[in-house]
């Protein structure tokens, strides 16, 4: 049986459309059923608390991100910058790894260049080009968790930098290259 060129093109186009739309529908359904991502944050310097769903129905929630940026702000200058979503996802992964809702005490989130320079004058452990300046790092502690143990949990995620600051009793996590250190 001979099939004409026009008939072949028509059938091919219909097959292509049938194959595209179900995939799009399935992709949308997957996004809508994606689990919510929540964070509970407490800024140790300002006393502010935030319990927020920052990701729902496959999308980041812009109002929630603004609230998070505010909690992570440089408390010394009041300067606010966007915090990388990858960092929020890392905190969420830590919470999931602990297998329970986690209250993160935020010791240092975003830092202005000026604040970072001042801290460098006081401590040799503050990096000149700290990822805090980019909104890509946070120093945390979790109530009732030993920070040594928290450090180990963070290292197992293999998702960026992890620093343990024993004397100051906090763990630094960032979304830079995978590495870890103790001070």
Predicted regions and their residues:
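N-terminal secretory signal peptides and thylakoid transit peptides that target proteins
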Residues: 1-19
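Catalytic cores and adjacent binding grooves of peptidoglycan-active enzymes
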Residues: 2, 37-42, 125-183
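C-terminal segment of N-terminal export signals and the immediately downstream linker at the start
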Residues: 22-52
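Active-site acidic/histidine clusters and adjacent loop/turn architecture
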Residues: 59-105
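Extracytoplasmic/secreted envelope proteins and their assembly/folding machinery
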Residues: 88-92, 116, 147, 151
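Sec/Tat-exported extracytoplasmic proteins
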Residues: 94-98, 102, 114, 144, ...
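Acidic helix-start/capping segments at beta-turn-to-alpha-helix junctions
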Residues: 103-117
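Charged, often glycine-rich, active-site loop that binds/positions anionic groups
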Residues: 114-128
